[in-house]
């Protein structure tokens, strides 16, 4: 029999909707005994109601698509929790920039902002970065919207324009970012980015260059694969050289000397030329960051028309998983001491590798205590696989809507979701999807009975909230 608590949780937590007369803190919920109708939790949000987050109120509309699972992560700020692996990466990057790059008064050149609110306007997240109105990155299915005008930032780049407009020329921004995405060991709806920006005046860029006083930052020409229409080739090449030198030094600081690096041309709306940096780590090429010469239109609109600059962005989880051998992105949200205590280091630059097995004395028998502490597994508990298949509704279905339901109902019991089959009926032309959900707890073994209750709750929530027709 389906566990009603899971079903109620799906209805109660999937989309945060409240009557205006009952606006409250974002973690207050309806009583378990009152089971609301599925129509109250439509994917399109609840126009006329209000969402409260971080002390501010936001009217909901047809773009509201936040889940309680995601909202519960807002304010956790893992990157600011001392000794957390993401904090260690942030501190190592910050220390490197503080020590390597000094201003005229021998103070750090780069300022650091790691407590900016994750709630931004859609203008900040998209328009300020020159992202076109029809760009696919704006899709409701890929982002978490509070309403049409506000969202949880999809990247730390959302703060670039504001900080440039405030007169800053060199800064790092660190924060949690939110994207609707697939479910596997490498992806989570909340992750953390570190953004870097540096602007140069004509004097700063050409200082030390022979005949530098005769060189210019800007010209009127045509855009090419190598530069923007407003930049001189001399300026672009110097900015590009500085950017790549700064980032090569950074990854060498993190990974050690002798690291092999390569640059891959790519595209970002807010930089040109743009690059991805890859490193050869243990014989495998890994992408670690994206970067490029900032679009001058962005720089000009922020009030820095006399400067040219670069920007880069990297994912803290990606670096931490490689540096510390962390196998599953869910672990970053663990409060298990067996995980956290491994990163309490006296020196942030100390080498550490996550141990999947370790000694846990309290589980040992009396005889074992005499012989030594017991060796216990961490996150290697057996997986349980369950499939779900259903006919899609005629419209308004996205896979990310289903993934959000799975995350909301199953929480961190869900390790992975794979679309394993698509079928179109030859007569009705209806489409069916079949997903395989992998359940695995990070700290204990799950029973099939326990998983079946969660899985059945996922099935019912999908039917009631997405309008699919079950084939189970």
Swiss-Prot record:
Record EC number: 6.1.1.20
Subcellular location: Mitochondrion matrix; Mitochondrion
Sequence positions that bind substrate: 157-160, 179, 186-188, 193-195, 287, 312
Encoding gene, per UniProt annotation: Fars2
Keyword presence, Disulfide bond: no
Residue list for modification N6-acetyllysine: 202
Record NCBIfam families: pheS_mito (TIGR00469)
InterPro entries: aa-tRNA-synth_II (IPR006195), aa-tRNA-synth_II/BPL/LPL (IPR045864), Fdx_antiC-bd (IPR005121), Fdx_antiC-bd_sf (IPR036690), Phe-tRNA-synth_IIc_mito (IPR004530), Phenylalanyl-tRNA_Synthase (IPR002319)
Family to which this protein belongs: Belongs to the class-II aminoacyl-tRNA synthetase family.
GO CC terms in record: cytoplasm; mitochondrial matrix; mitochondrion
PROSITE patterns: AA_TRNA_LIGASE_II, FDX_ACB
Main location: mitochondrion
EC class: ligase
GO terms, molecular function: ATP binding; phenylalanine-tRNA ligase activity; tRNA binding
Catalytic activity entry: tRNA(Phe) + L-phenylalanine + ATP = L-phenylalanyl-tRNA(Phe) + AMP + diphosphate + H(+)
GO biological process: phenylalanyl-tRNA aminoacylation; tRNA processing
Domain of life: Eukaryota
Protein name in UniProt: Phenylalanine--tRNA ligase, mitochondrial
Alphabetical UniProt keywords: Acetylation, Aminoacyl-tRNA synthetase, ATP-binding, Ligase, Mitochondrion, Nucleotide-binding, Protein biosynthesis, Transit peptide
Tissue expr: Mainly expressed in the Purkinje cell of cerebellum.
Function: Is responsible for the charging of tRNA(Phe) with phenylalanine in mitochondrial translation. To a lesser extent, also catalyzes direct attachment of m-Tyr (an oxidized version of Phe) to tRNA(Phe), thereby opening the way for delivery of the misacylated tRNA to the ribosome and incorporation of ROS-damaged amino acid into proteins.
Domain called FDX-ACB: residue spans: 379-471
Segments forming a coiled coil: none
Description of how the protein assembles with itself and partners: Monomer.
Keyword Coiled coil listed: no
């Amino acid at each position: 029999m389906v566990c009603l608590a899971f079903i109620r949780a799906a209805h109660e937590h999937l989309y945060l909707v409240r009557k205006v007369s009952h606006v409250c803190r974002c973690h207050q919920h309806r009583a378990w005994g009152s089971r609301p109708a599925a129509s109250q939790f439509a994917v399109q949000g609840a126009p006329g109601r209000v969402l409260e987050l971080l002390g501010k109120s936001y009217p909901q509309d047809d773009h509201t698509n936040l889940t309680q699972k995601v909202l519960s992560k807002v304010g956790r700020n893992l990157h600011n929790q001392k000794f957390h692996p993401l904090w260690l990466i942030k501190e190592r990057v910050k220390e490197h920039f503080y020590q390597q790059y000094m201003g005229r008064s021998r103070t750090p050149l780069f300022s650091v902002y790691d407590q900016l609110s994750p709630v931004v306007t859609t203008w900040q997240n998209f328009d300020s970065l020159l992202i076109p109105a029809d760009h696919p990155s704006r899709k409701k299915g890929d982002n978490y919207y509070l309403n049409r005008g506000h969202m949880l930032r999809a990247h730390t780049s959302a703060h670039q324009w504001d900080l440039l407009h405030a007169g800053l020329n060199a800064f790092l921004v660190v924060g949690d970012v939110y994207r609707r995405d697939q479910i596997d060991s490498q992806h989570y709806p909340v992750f953390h980015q570190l953004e870097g920006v540096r602007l140069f005046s004509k004097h700063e860029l050409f200082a030390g260059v022979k005949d530098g006083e005769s060189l210019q930052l800007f010209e009127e020409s045509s855009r090419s694969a190598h530069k923007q229409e407003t930049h001189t080739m001399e300026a672009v090449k110097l900015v590009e050289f500085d950017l790549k030198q700064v980032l090569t030094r950074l990854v060498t600081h993190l990974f050690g000397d002798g690291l092999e690096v390569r640059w891959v041309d790519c595209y970002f709306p807010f930089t040109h030329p743009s690059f991805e940096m890859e490193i050869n780590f243990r014989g495998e090429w890994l992408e670690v960051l994206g970067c490029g010469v900032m679009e001058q239109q962005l720089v000009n609109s922020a009030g820095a028309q006399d400067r040219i600059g670069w920007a880069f962005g990297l994912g803290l989880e990606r670096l931490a998983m490689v540096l510390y051998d962390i196998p599953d992105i869910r672990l970053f949200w663990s409060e298990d001491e067996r995980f956290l205590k491994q990163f309490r280091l006296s020196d942030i630059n100390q080498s550490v590798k996550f141990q999947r097995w370790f000694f846990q004395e309290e589980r040992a028998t009396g005889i074992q205590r005499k012989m030594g502490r017991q060796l216990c597994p961490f996150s290697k508990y057996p997986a349980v696989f369950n499939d779900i298949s259903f006919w899609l509704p005629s419209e308004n279905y996205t896979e990310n809507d289903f993934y959000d339901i799975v995350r909301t109902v199953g929480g961190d019991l869900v390790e992975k979701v794979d679309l394993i089959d698509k079928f179109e009926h030859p007569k009705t032309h209806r489409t069916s999807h079949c997903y395989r959900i992998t359940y695995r707890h990070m700290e204990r073994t799950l029973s099939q009975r326990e998983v079946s209750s969660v899985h059945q709750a996922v099935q019912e929530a999908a039917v009631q909230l997405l309008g699919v027709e079950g084939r189970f």
